[in-house]
Amino acid sequence: MFLDKYDYVILDIIQTYKKNNKNELIKLSQLETAFWSRIEHDDAQSTRSAQLGERIANLYLEGYIMNKSNTGYRLTKKGKEELSFQEVEVGL
């Protein structure tokens, strides 16, 4: 699976939320709100081409995120590694 900028936005939102909220997991509604506010000035916002639900499902199926006991989303080890790898590449 090739991850694009919107997938990385989702991974970053999940990781940031967990860090800022004492390891609390992010709920789907909170993830949606944060995602759309983060990309509100992006062209994809107006066309809804970001397709949030499909992206979350694909990230879940590919093992980047998990929904722990239906209480909220968190990154898997694979998701954390991918996000940190992307941050290193962007920093170069």
Segments predicted by a language model, with ranges:
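Short amphipathic alpha-helical interaction segments
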Residues: 43-61
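Short amphipathic alpha-helical segments
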Residues: 8, 28-29, 53
